[in-house]
Structures are given as structure tokens and as C-alpha cells.
Amino acid sequence: MLFLSFYAGSWESWICCCCVIPVDRPWDRGRRWQLEMADTRSVYETRFEAAVKVIQSLPKNGSFQPTNEMMLRFYSFYKQATEGPCKLSRPGFWDPIGRYKWDAWSSLGDMTKEEAMIAYVEEMKKIIETMPMTEKVEELLHVIGPFYEIVEDKKNSKSSDLTSDLGNVLTSSNAKAVNGKAESSDSGAESEEEEAQEELKGAEQSGSDDKKMMTKSTDKNLEIIVTNGYKDSFAQDSDIHTDSSRSARRSEDKKPTDQSSQQTGNTVLCVHQDTNEDPGEDASGVHHLTSDSDSEVYCDSMEQFGQEEYYLGGDPAQHLEGSGFCEDAQLSPGNGSIGKMQMRAVKGKGEVKHGGEDGRSSSGTPHREKRGGESEDISGVRRGRGHRMPHLSEGTKGRQVGSGGDGERWGSDRGSRGSLNEQIALVLIRLQEDMQNVLQRLHKLETLTASQAKLSWQTSNQPSSQRPSWWPFEMSPGALAFAIIWPFIAQWLVHLYYQRRRRKLN
């Protein structure tokens, strides 16, 4: 209590100010300690009590019936958590159930109460999924919270490459390129990754490109664009057809060219619409596309197959009419190679030269470079076995278009294609994740089974008593027989002693 005195003017006033200063009393310290202890132990005790309520609320004839071993474990942990280590004597032979319970309880030894509570809750977590959902179970789940472990997938290099790259395909829209050469590997899975990557861009433009398919124009010229940094000029052809009879022979003749083209980018076929082209340049230029593995054009989706029929079947003067749009049609073999042949129809005049600049001159006429008297071998970029373009005939001329080797993909994106490859990629990712989860569960089950087998083997190897299993008494049969016969033998010996004594007296 603190008193303050003030003097004001002609009168004197006393103002009493009471300041209560908190004092750390012993009973307050004890109360705070009890609250802190209640907070710290409430976590384990609350979970333990909720788990005990779940076990006690199980109906006798319910859908979930725990085994005897499971109930013995719960009993032993409950007794250890509530009463501590077992200090009682073992029940007699007339109480076999009590003896089993005593054995389970005493096997825990000096386990603390907190450890017993934790073990009780952990045992409950193993079976909580198989139990019917009741109010007690919901309360236990609310108290425990999320108890599932988040296990990261540990995959080998091949499987991790597949899932990680396919995951990047779904989020990234740009292809990897270094110095004008698309990065590639020898696995067939990466070809599906690049296909799925470009399908996402093609799906967005599917609506607009389908409408442009119906437009018509008059003149058309077929032009080959090689995006590998080399300058190659080819003539045009009025017909694109497939021929499989010469694929084996040409595969042997063009191995050097194929090896050089494997290190380059993608081969693109472009259909240019140019009204000022010289008619003399329209000659036989582009020959057929063949495959090392099969004799047919491989299509990834039904829409692509229909588009390739549109270009490859019938008169090109009818089917290539109205090609005022850009479309990339990927031709990939069935073995998963990612060699890409892009057919592109570009409306207007001009070309793209080395460096990516427009090929038109200042006067508006396209810059042309012609090369005659030589034979060109064009091969699609192959991985393993891929598509190949045979060499062109001698004296072919045409418009050449190249890239500057800067790694950029120029031209329009892939046209409309179906979502078949995208769905396949997603299914593969989910299937692989499910397989990894199944393998992890199987591994856990195997380890659990091995530990249980080891535990049962240890318990079976413990020295058992000499009595048979059917004997109901605690002592052995021989000891019981001796206990029964011993009084008779003792009485007989006493009787013999008295008889001899009487004979001596007589």
C-alpha cells in the first residue's frame, strides 16, 4: 500500500493511492506449474483417452472384430499407461486368460506411462482405417490430426526423367534448344514429352486453324525449309507420296548424311503460296518420305491422320488449295524417335534466310539462291530409327530457307492436333506414381511381416516348461504323481519300521 501526500493552496488534501504490486506467492507458483504440466501432457493424454473410448465403444457383434493378439497389445499398453510397470503376481493355472494378460503386461518391462500412451495411439493408427466411422472415431481423428507420412518418390534415373520431363511439358511451352540444335536423348519417352509439349500449343489454336482449312487460293509452291543452319535449296514437287520399297536400300546409301543430320535441328516442309513465282521452277523436287521401321506414315492422332490424308492423298492442286495457314504435321516413327518433319504452308512471298531475317529485297522481290548440278540428301533428324527424306534428283532447284543457328524455333506453332498424346502422358504419369505408391506399401508390408515373423520365432524359442500342452496343472505330471504316491510310501516305510521293532521286542 503506497500513500502519496499533496498540498494545494490554503487547504490540505490527502489523496490515498493504492498500488497493488503482484507478489510471487508459493501457491501461485504451484498453480502455474500445474497448468503448464496440464498443457504439456494434455496432448498425449487426450489422444490416449480418445483412443481408449474408441476401443471401449466397439460393439461385440460389429463389423470390426479385433484379434486376440491385438486386444492383448491394447490391454498391456493400457495397463502400463494407467498403472505403470506390472508388480502383481502371476495368476494361478485356473485363470488362463488372466495369465495371458499378465504375460502381455509384464513383457513391457519398465516402459514409462508416456511411452505406453504413445504406443497405444500408434497401434490405433494402424487399424483406424478399417473401423466404421462413428462419433468416437471422428473425435479421435480430430484429436490426432493428420498422421499420414509424406513419402517422396525415390525413382531411378530413367523413371525420374520421364515423370519430371513430362511434368515440365505440362507447365512449359518452350522447347529446349542450344545453338540451333534441339536437345535430345536416345529414349523414346522424351519424344512423347516433346509431342505433348507442342500439343498444348496446338490445342489453343485448333479452333482458328480448322476454320482456315476451308479457305481457298489459286497458286501454290512446295518449298523445303531446313532449320539446321545449312544452306540447301530444293525444287518443288506437285506430288508427295510414300514409297516403302526403297527404304532399305536408301538406308544403306545415306548413312553419312543421316549421321550428320542427327546432330541438327528439325526438318520442316513448308508450302509457300507465292503469286510471283516463275513457272519454270515448278518441277519434280520433293520425293517421298520413308521410314526405317515401317512403310506407312505414323500419325499420333486421328486429326493429324486426317490432315496428312488431305495433303498426301489425291491431286495436290485440289488438296493444297486454300493453304493460307501454317501447320506443322509431325511425322514420328512408332519406335519413339523424335525426328520432326514440319509441313508448313505460308501465305505470301519471301523467305527466311540465315539469321532469321526476312528474305525479301528492298524492291519487294524475294531473294533467291539457286544451286544446280548437284544432288542433295535430306534426312529427318532421327534417334535410333527415324523418318528419312531420300535424295533429290540432279539439277533440282528451289527456294532455300535456313535459320541462323540461334536455337529459336521460327514459324508457326503446331496446328490442331488431338489431345491423345496429352492424355497418354498424363495416364503414364499417374500410373507410375500409383506403381511407386504400391511398391512402397508392399515394402512396408514386407518389413512388417519380417519383423512379426522374427518376433514369433523369438517367442517360440523361449524355454518352455516340461509339461505337455494338454496338462491343465502348473506342476509337471511326474511331480504330481510323486506327490500323490509319497504318502503311501511313507506310511509303508513307517509300518515296516514298527514291525521290525515289535519283532525285536518279542
Swiss-Prot record:
Location relative to the cell: Peroxisome membrane
Amino acids binding an acyl-CoA: 55-64, 75-79, 101, 120
Pfam families listed in its UniProt record: ACBP
Biased composition regions of type Polar residues, renumbered to the chain: 258-267
Gene Ontology molecular function: fatty-acyl-CoA binding
Main subcellular localisation: membrane
Signal peptide coordinates: none
UniProt KW keywords: Acetylation, Autophagy, Coiled coil, Lipid-binding, Membrane, Peroxisome, Phosphoprotein, Transmembrane, Transmembrane helix, Transport
Described function: Acyl-CoA binding protein which acts as the peroxisome receptor for pexophagy but is dispensable for aggrephagy and nonselective autophagy. Binds medium- and long-chain acyl-CoA esters.
UniProt protein name: Acyl-CoA-binding domain-containing protein 5
Organism: Rattus norvegicus (Rat)
Lineage of source species: Eukaryota, Metazoa, Chordata, Craniata, Vertebrata
